[in-house]
Curated annotation (Swiss-Prot):
It comes from Aspergillus oryzae (strain ATCC 42149 / RIB 40) (Yellow koji mold). Glycans are attached at N330. Pfam families: Gal80p_C-like, GFO_IDH_MocA. This is Dehydrogenase aclE. InterPro entries: Gal80p-like_C, Gfo/Idh/MocA-like_OxRdtase_N, Gfo/Idh/MocA_oxidoreduct, NAD(P)-bd_dom_sf. Pathway: Mycotoxin biosynthesis. It is an enzyme of class 1 (oxidoreductase). Coiled coil: none annotated. The keyword Cytoplasm does not apply.
Length: 366
């Protein structure tokens, strides 16, 4: 067996219910990826948590670090994975880069465009490889849509529209309250918008012009304690709703986006339609997290007596750890580097600037 890539995961705690366990450890240890990767170190915020995490994941106690600097200096770590709350991602990823280690950091990885640009620049200077966690573009449904679009079977693309309604940003656990402080850059625009609009740009090209509006419908959101009990939240100054229209790609296809939060009194909905002259595609499901909770993919075609949506059968509806496979394959189309992710931050910045000014705007994506 060839040498496996050795991972040091920042934020992989002893708690098996923590999201880092689902996003990283499970696909790395329960799929064919386990033959290509191994977890050799973890890092947590205190010595006690670091030691507990190391023991929980079958590592020697000394492989539980309480600083990223120490983890990154470990000669048995090839790739540092940063999976912590948004406000600290850039700082911790920078520590790995300064140590000369390749880095995988989740999206969003910075609180603003300037911080994202600084991290990408330092990665270039240190000549390290990087990957940003934008797995929505790797969902089997999105890749199938790309295949169909490339085939030309839809004909000329006339428009695309995306509708997302979700209670996710109102029912965060109390430890996610940082998302309600706009300075942290962790809100419906950066998180839901960043992931889903990245997939849209992956299929159709970058937005050539956009006009956005954001609002805050719930200034005091509902939070849950660790037992799931509802409790009153702190005051919110982050947007919980945004809409956008504009044009996308070299053909300047009209685009409409609506993402809004609602209480759990209404079912969640994800719906994305790409309308073509010869046929159309529709993705529809119960969650905006389409890479984890799979939507149905449907297609219709022109020329039949009765036009209706027909579901497309996929061999797999979820591919756990798809970004890790892309890293192994050195798949430059599916891997999003820090430099490429800066373009997504420019898009987010343009959305927020447009919402503040009320004016149509654009961003640089060369």
């Amino acid at each position: 067996m060839s040498k496996r890539i050795r991972l040091g995961i920042v934020g992989l705690s002893a708690d098996p219910s923590h999201c880092t366990n689902y996003i990283h450890k499970i696909p790395l240890t329960t799929t064919p990826l386990k033959e290509k990767y191994e977890i050799t170190a973890v890092s947590m915020s205190s010595p006690e948590k670091a030691e507990a995490a190391a023991i929980a994941h079958g590592l020697p106690r000394e492989r539980g670090y309480h600083s990223v600097e120490s983890l990154a200096k470990d000669p048995d770590v090839d790739l540092v994975v940063v999976s912590v709350k948004v406000p600290r991602r850039a700082e911790l990823a920078m520590a790995a880069i300064e140590a000369g280690k390749d880095v995988y950091v989740e999206w969003p990885f910075a609180s603003n465009l300037a911080a994202a640009e600084a991290l990408a620049q330092r990665a270039r200077e240190r000549q390290v490889k990087s990957m940003v966690g934008l797995p929505t573009r790797l969902a089997p449904q999105v890749l199938k849509m790309k295949e169909i679009l490339r085939s030309g079977s839809l004909g000329r693309i006339l428009a695309t529209n995306l509708l997302v309604t979700d209670d996710l940003f109102l029912k965060f656990h109390a430890d996610k309250r940082h998302s309600h402080d706009k300075t942290n850059g962790a809100n419906i625009v950066t998180i839901a918008g960043g992931h889903l609009l990245d997939a849209m740009a992956f299929l159709l090209g970058e937005f050539t012009t956009l006009h956005a509006h954001t609002s805050m419908l719930f200034p005091k959101p509902v939070l849950c304690d660790t037992d799931g009990n509802l409790k009153t939240g702190q005051f919110n100054d982050s947007p919980d709703t945004f809409t956008m229209h504009g044009k996308i790609g070299i053909s300047e296809v009209p685009v409409s986006v609506c993402m809004y939060s609602h209480p759990p009194t209404t079912p969640n909905l994800f719906q994305w339609v790409i309308t073509g002259e010869k046929g159309s595609l529709k993705m529809e499901g119960p969650s905006l997290m389409i890479h984890a909770i799979p939507p149905k993919l449907m297609m219709t075609s022109f020329g039949s007596e009765t036009v209706c949506w027909e579901e497309i059968s996929l061999e797999n509806t979820i591919v756990s750890g798809a970004e890790y496979q892309a890293w192994l394959d050195n798949d430059t189309e599916r891997i999003v580097t820090l430099d490429e992710a800066v373009v997504r931050y420019r898009m987010v910045d343009a959305i927020l600037r447009s919402a503040e000014s009320g004016q149509c705007t654009s961003y640089r994506y060369d």
